[in-house]
Amino acid sequence: MSFKNRGDYNFTPRNVVSRNSVFFMCLASFCLGMFFTNRMWNIVPEARGISRLSKLSLSSSDCDKKNVLDYGNNTIGILDKSISNLEMKLVAARAERESLSGKFNISNEAKKRKYFMVIGINTAFSSRKRRDSVRSTWMPQGENLKKLEEEKGIIVRFVIGHSVLSHGILDKAIEAEEKTHGDFLRLEHTEGYMKLSAKTKTFFATAVSLWDAEFYIKVDDDVHVNLASLKKALSAHQNKPRVYVGCMKSGPVLARKSVKYHEPEYWKFGEVGNKYFRHATGQFYAISKDLATYILINQDLLHKYANEDVSLGSWFIGLNVEHVDEKRLCCSTSQDCELKAMMGHVCAASFDWKCSGICRSAERMADVHERCGEPQNALWTSNS
């Protein structure tokens, strides 16, 4: 190949590359480029795949760790609950031993057995006629009282402490009555109207120490009770751990000293004219075993207000307790309980609100029993 310069001289270089060589060099470069490019594209997805697998592996590892932690936390929670229950039982057992310490003669069989309910009938030294009216109506006597315990799991006792002069004439009268009927629970408590809160606390602590039951009940000796209907009403709450059953009310806090239910600590409930927190009326209420055990363990710490029903309500107000407003426990004796009995909806407990019990109960209990009582064999023929 020749070139012509400005001076018109022909010039032919020796090292000039031919067109064919250039073409083959370009083709070779292109092929090499394609080869390396394809190889790099193969490497990148592999790297991305490895990265994705690593992330999945890490994610799976994190999930496994979370599951292990959740399982561990749940297990710890269950163990904590079990330990708390065991601690409560241990404290209750210690309190039981200290509370009883050989004061009561209860058979080992009675201690081991599970009862449905323990009914404590609050009574006083002067209430012999009331007790006799209860014995002649709704409270079984003699062998039937034992049969009630053995077949139906129901304990019924009149509850009373001792007089100021221990072993005095009043105490001896109760001892003689006990020999005849065998239906008393004597408490380590000095009797007195202004000491009802202390008596209630001592009753529940003593009862839960003596008998293992689903429910513990306090009822006044001027209230009529239908035992089969009562058992039916409480059976609906049998599997609840902390339940407080009664006719719930919220009356005014009485600040004046001249009134019957005066509350000396009225200032704790706020301004004058305020009402009490919701609590069961004092004529009749029932609590589950856990709550009775709570009273047993903490009896030295629980504050006592002037009125025992308010005191009981105050002990539960800050706890995780289910309050059950059960109107079958507070029927009126005028026409209410009779009409309900005729309709087949027998009341569990009946009294007169105006008298805070059955008015002249020693005289009228038999009449109320005839009008408002359940069928004679209702308790014995029931399946429960």
Swiss-Prot record:
Cofactor requirement: Mn(2+)
The UniProt record lists the keyword Glycoprotein: yes
Keywords, alphabetical: Glycoprotein, Glycosyltransferase, Golgi apparatus, Manganese, Membrane, Signal-anchor, Transferase, Transmembrane, Transmembrane helix
Glycosylation sites recorded in the entry for this protein: 73, 105
UniProt GO MF annotations: hexosyltransferase activity
Listed GO biological process terms: protein glycosylation
Location of this chain's protein in the cell: Golgi apparatus membrane
GO cellular component terms, semicolon-separated: Golgi membrane
EC top class, as a word: transferase
EC number annotated for this UniProt entry: 2.4.1.-
Pfam family, one: DUF4094
UniProt membrane topology term: Single-pass type II membrane protein
Recorded metabolic or biological pathway in which this protein acts: Protein modification; protein glycosylation
Membrane-spanning segments: 21-43
Function: Beta-1,3-galactosyltransferase that transfers galactose from UDP-galactose to substrates with a terminal glycosyl residue.
Homology family: Belongs to the glycosyltransferase 31 family.
Name of the molecule in the record: Probable beta-1,3-galactosyltransferase 1
Organism: Arabidopsis thaliana (Mouse-ear cress)
Lineage per the UniProt record: Eukaryota, Viridiplantae, Streptophyta, Embryophyta, Tracheophyta
The encoding gene: B3GALT1
